[in-house]
């Protein structure tokens, strides 16, 4: 891999650091971060979710905590609002809530595009790439080669870059790629690296996407890799789909650190639970060489027989941060779906991340399952915002709009619903004054299902594949359903029964659809602890372009 694009990024970074607030600095910043004034579709620009100021983004990459900051790199097109010219964008946060956009970290060039990968802090300097007193950040990413690269066009291999200034600038390793297949492959990608403490080595998961194989490797120095094993399914039920972005994560079962299970996250496209792309997972054991799942759905099973991190349509390319200070892994995903991502009606940007989420493993119905909740930092921040407490409401065969004080387009709603004798009960968010527009969260007592229904949520005809309803089985707990709902200008995220179920959907409502209502159908339901917290007043958490 040639380093011309990296050196260009270095020159831009040095210019940004050196320049004062003048024309040269403004132009350099705009070229790398896109800080032109907002235009296009600001009514759908996220306030709570990271999105670049302009242009296309997809997979989160290089998720790492270093020197007091969370780093979010991501697949980025620096020159357009469609997929292409794959490079690594870059943003940072100190709290997982407020994000700052930085110049492009690694840029596509004439012979190579920079596909997905991961970053670790090489605190022991096992790679030998650090400088005195400064351990390096090491990125492993997929090089996709073009004509003139010395590889067949389209070949994918794993390459390395490193930083000795906490991620501000990146230097390509002189002998890239560091890992290839023999024969070379056009589907070998997405390295995720972590430290495997029991074996004192680095562990990498990658995929051969079209073969539905996760390949595991080990290394002592992040440069030289040896094969460990393959993980696949004996009867892959989704022929034609791709496996992408694997991540192997250890978690204590029910909080017992003496009982560690391993979770293999595999993002699949298409064939997800909600249609199109999604993130499934397997729980099992890892012995230092081989991952063995506890259960695999029988041959011929449909998606409902598999486990999913999220049952909505817009949760893909999920991965976890490396080196986080807390005890629970923190994951984040791309908030879109390959079924319609290229047609999402936003401009001058297209693509956003989900809320960061904490992962835990709990025994549910006799099996270990992931529990997914908003990151504690988000909830702590939201807890400090002004809230309206509606108290307890009883609704019988009716829809009741909440008080005017609950109106807003960026908010967190918490409530416990007791459906009682109602056939269906729930909430409507981003509801219009005439009631014709709104996103419905519906519990069906007979079917024991929770539905996120965006069929009347606003603009929905931009793509025929923009699915309307997303349904998940969910029994009540002691006759109740606990919900945490996070509403942004262009999305709704639902966390039910303490994270047992999550649903994430994009929505595109008119700006004046700012009301909240509760409803019960064919009977009585009660809504207790109903609290609406406004999260927009006082400034956005969304990205601002910044010099390093």
Residue spans of the language-model regions?
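Beta-rich carbohydrate-recognition and catalytic domains
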Residues: 31-190, 195-243, 252-310, 326, ...
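Short beta-strand/loop turn elements enriched in aromatics
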Residues: 5, 14, 32-33, 447-456
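Catalytic nucleophile-His microenvironment captured as a short glycine-rich beta-strand/loop
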Residues: 249
